[in-house]
């Protein structure tokens, strides 16, 4: 997917969006919005010149000088370091990961998983989840870990990495329950026929 940047965003639209955000927030208040599938956290600090919102890999800005035009604002933002990659969409965007988590969530039962009870504990909650999701330990791993689907969804929403390997989470790492089996010899869940 291609990044959506300032060159692809009408300056007047960016001006209108950031001006609206400024009016919706009060001093020292935190909030958030979704722009092109990314959550952008907004923190308003009283300042008549600059208003910025920063999210996971995203930055929007509103530089307001009396009489400034959208073209001047565009030039100022382009000059600011780090703005060139504004509003990226990628395979690992939270929305596509959340969709994959929803697709692969299943009801956890010992009968279905055929594994020791302790292997059904989520490494995040340290409890057996009611609803679980299997996640490969890394992109090229055949080993999977069972997570509580709500906890894992929250981790993805917050921009976290894989809790065990610290690797960035990709949609291809989230596996449906019919593709995982407990391997007694290895003592963990693995991709079937691997």
Swiss-Prot record:
It is an enzyme of class 2 (transferase). It holds the Pfam family T3SS_NleG. InterPro entries: Effector_NleG, Effector_NleG_sf. Induction: Transcribed for 2-5 hours after treatment that induces type 3 secretion system expression. It is found in: Secreted; Host cytoplasm. Its EC number is 2.3.2.27. Disruption phenotype: Significant reduction in diarrhea in C3H/HeJ mice, moderate reduction in bacterial colonization in mice. Its main location: secreted. It catalyses: S-ubiquitinyl-[E2 ubiquitin-conjugating enzyme]-L-cysteine + [acceptor protein]-L-lysine = [E2 ubiquitin-conjugating enzyme]-L-cysteine + N(6)-ubiquitinyl-[acceptor protein]-L-lysine. Keywords: Host cytoplasm, Secreted, Transferase, Ubl conjugation pathway, Virulence. GO terms for biological process: biological process involved in symbiotic interaction. One of its GO terms (molecular function) is ubiquitin-protein transferase activity. Effector proteins function to alter host cell physiology and promote bacterial survival in host tissues. This protein is probably an E3 ubiquitin-protein ligase that interferes with the host's ubiquitination pathway and targets host proteins for proteasomal degradation. Mice infected with a strain of bacteria deleted for this gene have less severe diarrhea. Belongs to the NleG E3 ligase family. This is Probable E3 ubiquitin-protein ligase NleG1.
């Amino acid at each position: 997917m291609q990044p959506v940047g300032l060159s692809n965003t009408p300056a007047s639209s960016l001006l209108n969006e950031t001006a609206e955000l400024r009016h919706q927030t009060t001093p020292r208040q935190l909030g958030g919005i979704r722009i092109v599938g990314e959550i952008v956290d907004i923190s308003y600090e009283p300042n008549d010149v600059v208003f910025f919102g920063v999210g996971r890999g995203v930055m929007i800005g509103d530089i307001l000088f009396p009489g400034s035009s959208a073209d001047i604002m565009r030039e100022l933002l382009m000059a600011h370091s780090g703005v060139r990659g504004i509003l990226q969409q990628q395979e690992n965007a939270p929305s596509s990961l959340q969709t994959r988590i929803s697709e692969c969530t299943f009801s956890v039962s010992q009968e279905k998983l055929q594994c020791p009870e302790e292997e059904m504990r989520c490494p995040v909650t340290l409890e057996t989840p009611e609803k679980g999701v299997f996640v490969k330990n890394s992109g090229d791993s055949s080993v999977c870990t069972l997570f509580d689907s709500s906890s894992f969804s929250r981790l993805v929403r917050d921009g976290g990495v894989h809790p065990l390997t610290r690797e960035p989470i990709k949609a291809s790492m989230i596996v449906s329950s019919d593709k995982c089996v407990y391997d007694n010899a290895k003592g963990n869940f693995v991709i079937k026929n691997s």
